[in-house]
Amino acid sequence: MSQTVSPPLYAAIDLGSNSFHMLVVRHIDGSVQTMAKIKRKVRLAAGLDENNALSTEAMQRGWDCLSLFAERLRDIPKENIRIVGTATLRTAINVDIFLEKANQILGYDINVISGEEEAATIYKGVAHTSGGSGRRLVVDIGGASTEMIIGEGFSAKALTSLKMGCVTWLERHFKDRQLTATNFNNAIEAAKSTLAPILDSYTDIGWDVCVGASGTVQALQEIMLAQGMDEVITHAKLKRLQKQAMITERLEELEIEGLTLERALVFPSGLSILIAIFELLEIDSMTLAGGALREGLAYEMVDEFRQEDIRARTIKSVQSRYQMDVSYSEQVAVVAQTLLEQAGAETWVSEPQAGVLLQTAAKLHEIGLTIDFKKGGEHSAYLLQNLDLPGFTRAQKHCLGELTRRYREQLTSLPEQHAISGTSSKRILRILRLAILLTHRRNPALEPEFKLTTDDNNLTLTLSKQWLADNPLTAAELEIESNRQTDIGWPLNIECL
């Protein structure tokens, strides 16, 4: 009996200045699927002395970590492994000593990449894992360097690696471990001085959106969500977190709701750098990218990926993996879009992301049926909130889950979420449920002609009297849906011509 061959594994290892990371993925159903993530805090940059020589202790921390990584590499083809060193290994004058033993431990060569190459690879990781359109400014704050990239689609237009990071700024500006206004101001002003040479060229190129691709940005988002804020980072929120940090006098005693102990040590220094970037470049807002350097390395090894629309690729991969009815999901999406346009896509639901989430929910709402029909909505919600979905943020995944949880039968109010406004999420849920009812026969030729009109929160769906008479089951279900929406304060009228 023949055995099915598992898809090959790929490993990307990033020997960073603060942490060493390993990402193990496989290529399946047109997507890169994460199989393992391993991270160890080594704080390599903290081992650099005034002459940029790495201490034996810092090198030993790195070697100990690589001994753990080596076990995981044994089962991965050599051609599917990429290992890179970044800022601290670029800087260390005794890097050859570290690399010689590191190569022996791993059994593979380590490539110490330039700052520009690091920036280019980071951008690839962002482009392959983050949704949205337009020109991006990408910010990645590492342990000893900060990469700044402007790009559009898969093409980078400006690449810069700056010699500042959360570990080096910690040792330089918070050496006394005091969280004072003076230390914060010194760290922020020093970061601005480091950024100044690129200010004119970057503002001349310009950007439409800004994304952060670092542990610092991830930590900030976790804190904001824990404190009931949305996931969008703004200057006001950064200054608010600075004030929270300064309540504690000493860094070792720092406690902020949502901040993990692991991230606490380099949080003030990373926060200072990000505040400087926001102020000098006059950034309005920033969101978290879906990936960065390691993801860029992984996607470079899998040369299939050139599709521009990351979200479309993700949806296609999920539909294939879970054997979904693609024709029907497309039918629901088309009807949902028609209903949205009739309601007023730019007025009744004004947020562009709401339309994206409606389309995605329409195409993936039946994913839970692969587990069980009875609780299909619950299973859909769980899967969409927990699957790796490149192109969608955590808040967007949460919103998708709550929409698909309620795609049929019993209707309850939506809980608070941070992807779009409560009004928009409520309205696209109403449209999703109507689209599913109008397409339940799963054949576009059997769809009725319909017209949806709105009066603020009141919906009126008009259909042919003859069609309703010829389709009594659908007519009854629409009447039930009218009662369900109206009962929770979402008035829905079904009228016939």
From Swiss-Prot:
Disulfide bonds: none
Reaction catalysed by this enzyme: guanosine 3'-diphosphate 5'-triphosphate + H2O = guanosine 3',5'-bis(diphosphate) + phosphate + H(+)
Pathway: Purine metabolism; ppGpp biosynthesis; ppGpp from GTP: step 2/2
UniProt GO BP: guanosine pentaphosphate catabolic process; guanosine tetraphosphate biosynthetic process; nucleobase-containing small molecule interconversion
Record keywords: Hydrolase
Broad enzyme group: hydrolase
Molecular function terms from GO: guanosine-5'-triphosphate,3'-diphosphate diphosphatase activity
Record keyword Hydrolase present: yes
Pfam families per record: Ppx-GppA, Ppx-GppA_III
InterPro entries linked: ATPase_NBD (IPR043129), GppA/Ppx_hydrolase (IPR050273), Guo-5TP_3DP_PyrP (IPR023709), Ppx_GppA_C (IPR048950), Ppx_GppA_N (IPR003695), PyroPPase_GppA_Ppx (IPR030673)
EC code: 3.6.1.40
Purpose of the protein: Catalyzes the conversion of pppGpp to ppGpp. Guanosine pentaphosphate (pppGpp) is a cytoplasmic signaling molecule which together with ppGpp controls the 'stringent response', an adaptive process that allows bacteria to respond to amino acid starvation, resulting in the coordinated regulation of numerous cellular activities.
Entry similarity comment: Belongs to the GppA/Ppx family. GppA subfamily.
Protein name: Guanosine-5'-triphosphate,3'-diphosphate pyrophosphatase
Species of the source: Vibrio atlanticus (strain LGP32) (Vibrio splendidus (strain Mel32))
Organism placement in taxonomy: Bacteria, Pseudomonadati, Pseudomonadota, Gammaproteobacteria, Vibrionales
Gene: gppA
